[in-house]
């Protein structure tokens, strides 16, 4: 069971690296919906990695995943209110992404065979922040999500939206 979880985390790690590379290589910032898909996959990846590191705090990991995904949904509704153009998926960036996924999986497989690099995942400071999180930080995150949701609804009801493209 643990071996399959480690293999899944390797796949998620390589896909995360390839997603980050595609953001910078293919100018994904032009499409906010693609950027949102990357952010959602990152939050799912973070919660899976935290579960593999410390499976005893599964309730805390679930709460963090819910906070991340609700934040992503708030951002998604904000972006949807600003987008006039539909998402146009081109085949060339998809093939490049697939190629980068294959390359990063091969590189990650070679690096993970050496146990020196395997200890790197135990020392990630960001993981320590989320695993040993206190309740005030968690409530601040929830409060920020509520404030963002209120501001997003205020922005969508503005009549003269300056952020939209003019026809």
Curated annotation (Swiss-Prot):
- What is the annotated localization of this protein? Mitochondrion membrane
Catalyses which reaction(s): a ubiquinone + NADH + 5 H(+)(in) = a ubiquinol + NAD(+) + 4 H(+)(out)
What transmembrane ranges does the database entry give? Answer: 5-25, 34-54, 60-80, 138-158
Keyword Iron-sulfur included in the entry's annotation: no
User: What does UniProt give as the signal peptide span?
Assistant: none
Q: Name one GO molecular function term.
A: NADH dehydrogenase (ubiquinone) activity
Q: What class of enzyme is it?
A: translocase
The keyword Oxidoreductase is annotated on this UniProt entry: no
Keywords from the UniProt entry = Electron transport, Membrane, Mitochondrion, NAD, Respiratory chain, Translocase, Transmembrane, Transmembrane helix, Transport, Ubiquinone
Membrane topology summary? Multi-pass membrane protein
According to the UniProt entry, what is the EC number of this protein?
A: 7.1.1.2
- Family in the record: Belongs to the complex I subunit 6 family.
Q: What does this protein do?
A: Core subunit of the mitochondrial membrane respiratory chain NADH dehydrogenase (Complex I) that is believed to belong to the minimal assembly required for catalysis. Complex I functions in the transfer of electrons from NADH to the respiratory chain. The immediate electron acceptor for the enzyme is believed to be ubiquinone.
The name of this protein is NADH-ubiquinone oxidoreductase chain 6
- Species name for this entry? Apis mellifera ligustica (Common honeybee)
């Amino acid at each position: 069971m643990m071996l399959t979880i480690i293999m899944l985390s390797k796949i998620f790690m390589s896909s995360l690296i390839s997603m980050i590379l595609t953001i910078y290589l293919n100018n994904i910032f032009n499409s906010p919906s693609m950027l949102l898909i990357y952010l959602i996959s990152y939050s799912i990846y973070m919660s899976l990695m935290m579960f593999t590191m410390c499976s005893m705090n599964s309730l805390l990991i679930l709460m963090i995943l819910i906070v991340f995904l609700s934040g992503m949904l708030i951002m998604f509704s904000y972006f949807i209110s600003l987008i006039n153009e539909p998402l146009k998926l081109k085949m060339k960036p998809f093939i490049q992404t697939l190629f980068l996924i294959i390359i990063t999986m091969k590189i990650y497989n070679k690096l993970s065979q050496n146990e020196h690099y395997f200890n790197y995942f135990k020392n990630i400071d960001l993981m320590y922040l989320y695993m040993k999180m206190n309740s005030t930080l968690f409530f601040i995150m929830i409060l920020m999500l509520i404030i963002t949701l209120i501001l997003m609804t205020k922005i969508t009801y503005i009549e003269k939206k300056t952020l939209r493209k003019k026809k």
